[in-house]
């Protein structure tokens, strides 16, 4: 996890707020470092984590986790981490050659119109039996992949609403979801993605949006992060700040716009 980011957001593994839905998004930049931050953050907090890895293998997240000081392998072996490896389980789901829990969760790959009930049941069964672990946490990297697989934005938003009602409201846990906005998306895909992002922004309590610098590439500044906070359940976002950042091998640095040594 990144101590500087914890300081900016006034959070720590010992004092984080339960019941929050955190939305991560990016454009012309890579917000994956935030996924790794929150994965290590909640594992350090002792939470039961259900991680839907739809774009990378378990070994990728494990290697990054090692650099951040957490062992995903140990967390999975002791039951603290439930990891759905989408790249691996999707093959069995499509070919119907595997009936494991992971492939059943991805049954929508065979029939996208069937919806995401199987995926929700996987999340529900993974987190409702948290045992002695801390509050349950759902992390998804990245949700927008489902659009490219033929699932409608409406079906995805229904899925997140069910997850939020179960994880955040009923179980008083947290959710972290990443969505990506690619410049080269087709018109239909872009329309679905815009609908998905608007719906998720309406649902979430905290939004972190990563994008490239307006001035272009800079070796010492990798991008900027816009942060929106919402205080109450039905309130509009009442606080907004922009920070610039640089990602390191074992962390990230954050600073107010214009205060980096690269621009002074």
Curated annotation (Swiss-Prot):
Enumerate the subcellular locations listed in this protein's record, separating them with semicolons.
Cytoplasm; Nucleus
Principal cellular location given in the protein's record: cytoplasm
Transmembrane regions: none
Protein keywords: Cytoplasm, Nucleus, tRNA processing
Please name the pathway: tRNA modification; 5-methoxycarbonylmethyl-2-thiouridine-tRNA biosynthesis
Could you say which protein family the record assigns here? Belongs to the ELP6 family.
Q: What is this protein called?
A: Elongator complex protein 6
* Organism, scientific name: Danio rerio
